[in-house]
């Protein structure tokens, strides 16, 4: 949802490129959870505690880096307030195992393999992103939504952790025929598809009609909009 919004508007990681104005949404699918992982020995219990710490914000040009900057800003922090590193999550996790990294951001579905592996070898804390600061983020950037990582998702994390997420979304072009996209949307939300989604990957169970429009920051394709109005998801 974040990348689609940036591409459509020519902002974020897309600010030096022409906007892709024909992008249209079919559906929000499942949450890509924002993980702020900290070493348990780092003393980091909140985003505020990142000040002065060694923090990986992901690679330059990545969506995660832009998301991390937005979150830091909501807490009154910038990259200059932390000892910023720009590493892939697996590299940041390796540094943390070696005692050379205090925290890192990761955006992806849970359980994330790199974090699960790290948690099995090193005591970690999953830092909450919540309260007024999270409300500021979701209020200013419609592609963010509240999310919760359940207790026990990662070894040593024994309580639910409230955080934010961006959506994995099904995107198409405004050039695609209305009737075709209508039928695709209708097929996604029929009973047979529901059975397949529930029987497959864990993320499939999170693909629901109730959340089909969550965090959608670009226009719906007219075919998808037609279906959602018929289904009562969108009002007149």
Residue locations for each model-derived region?
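Acidic, polar ligand-binding/catalytic clefts
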Residues: 1-30, 112
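Extracytoplasmic
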Residues: 20-23, 31-33, 52, 121-124, ...
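Structural recognition of the beta-strand scaffold that forms the well-ordered cores
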Residues: 25, 35-37, 56-57, 103-107, ...
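Short gly/ser/thr-rich secondary-structure transition/capping motifs
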Residues: 17-19, 37-39, 151
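Short, solvent-exposed loop/turn elements at domain surfaces
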Residues: 6, 34-36, 136
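Pocket-lining segment of extracytoplasmic ligand-binding domains
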Residues: 2, 11-13, 42, 79, ...
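Bilobed "Venus flytrap"/periplasmic-binding protein-like clamshell domains
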Residues: 28-98, 194, 210, 214, ...
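An extracytoplasmic/periplasmic, membrane-proximal ligand-sensing/linker region
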Residues: 87, 91, 97-98, 108-126, ...
């Amino acid at each position: 949802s974040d990348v689609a919004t940036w591409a459509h508007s020519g902002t974020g990681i897309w600010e030096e490129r022409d906007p892709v104005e024909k992008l249209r949404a079919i559906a929000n699918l499942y949450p890509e959870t924002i993980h702020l992982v900290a070493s348990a020995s780092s003393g980091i219990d909140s985003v505020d505690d990142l000040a002065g710490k060694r923090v990986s914000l992901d690679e330059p040009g990545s969506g995660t880096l832009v998301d991390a900057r937005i979150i830091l800003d909501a807490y009154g922090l910038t990259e200059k307030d932390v000892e910023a590193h720009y590493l892939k999550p697996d590299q940041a996790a390796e540094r943390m195992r070696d005692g050379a990294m205090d925290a890192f951001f990761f955006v992806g579905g849970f359980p994330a393999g790199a974090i699960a592996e790290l948690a099995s070898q090193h005591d970690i804390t999953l830092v909450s992103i919540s309260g007024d600061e999270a409300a500021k983020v979701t209020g200013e950037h419609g592609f963010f939504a509240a999310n919760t990582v359940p207790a026990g998702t990662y070894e040593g994390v024994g309580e639910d952790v409230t955080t934010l997420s961006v959506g994995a979304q099904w995107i198409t072009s405004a050039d695609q025929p209305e009737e075709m996209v209508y039928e695709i949307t209708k097929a996604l939300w029929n009973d047979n598809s529901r059975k397949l989604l529930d029987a497959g990957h864990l993320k499939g169970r999170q693909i629901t009609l109730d959340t089909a429009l969550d965090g959608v920051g670009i226009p719906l394709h007219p075919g998808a909009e037609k279906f959602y109005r018929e289904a009562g998801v969108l009002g007149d």
